[in-house]
Amino acid sequence: MSAPVDALARLGAAVRGGLADIGEAARLFVRLIVLMPAGLARFRLVADQVHFLGNHSLAIISVSGLFVGFVLGLQGYYTLQRYGSSEALGLLVALSLVRELGPVVTALLFAGRAGTALTAEIGLMKSGEQLAAMEMMAVDPVQRVLTPRFLGGLIAMPLLAAVFSAVGIIGGWAVGVLLIGVDAGAFWSQMQGGVDVFKDVGNGVIKSVVFGLTVTFVALRQGYACQPTPEGVARATTRTVVIASLAVLGLDFVLTALMFSI
């Protein structure tokens, strides 16, 4: 009897711990949303975080976007050529990047680069008792430390997604026009005529904002709740990448389904 009872007790403790974590995360999320107007008033702090997070990720975003554009140009051309529609390569590359690959791949790279940096920074501040010292001085660490970083990630992510998509389109053009020989006029005219600014670009912007909010919040939450030890900070950075990546992929499916149903 003891083994089943022990197993049931462990299951109950795990469920209770999971629900407590969800509650604490929801409480932190609500506080960050409520504190956003006050955070925007600290423009310099937010601008510093946008620069820090964007600068952290710009190189890998640009290089990745270029190679994704190369691959899209090659794969798209040889696929469209089967149906005699190779002149639509520009439209295929643009829609693939703006609606889907731009926001998603940027969010995954953002989680691995900037997200882990945020988690490590907050975790080290916690292990060094800097957050506790702020509380001792009646300074709210959520408002002072977390909110500017939350806003910085929310702003930086759409900008990085735009850079990724723009560089990817240039990569697709380079392969399609310069390497394969697709007509440049057809490449750009198909893109110009087929991409809807409000529907296609707007949907991509919405995705990038949602992904930026998600990745930044996960990174801040993991750093703020980690164990104040080197091992705890290391585990928190790993959890940031795993949780944020899964959340981005799941939200991408939900948002895509909603956008196509409208």
Regions found by a protein language model. Give the residues of each.
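Hydrophobic alpha-helical transmembrane segments of multi-pass membrane transport/permease proteins
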Residues: I60-Q75, V254
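Membrane-interface helix starts
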Residues: A38-V63, V242-S245
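Short, membrane-interfacial amphipathic segments enriched in basic
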Residues: M1-V46, Q222-Q227
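Final/C-terminal transmembrane alpha-helix of multipass membrane proteins
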Residues: V233, R239-T256
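Membrane-interfacial helix-loop-helix connectors in multipass membrane proteins
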Residues: Q75-V98, A166-V209, L213, F217-T237, ...
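Loop-to-helix entry region at the N-terminal start of transmembrane alpha-helices
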Residues: F52, H56, I60, S64, ...
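Start (N-cap) of specific transmembrane helices in multi-pass transporter permeases
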Residues: D140-A161, A236, T240
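Short cytoplasmic-facing helical segments at TM-TM junctions of multi-pass membrane proteins
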Residues: I122-T147, P230-V233
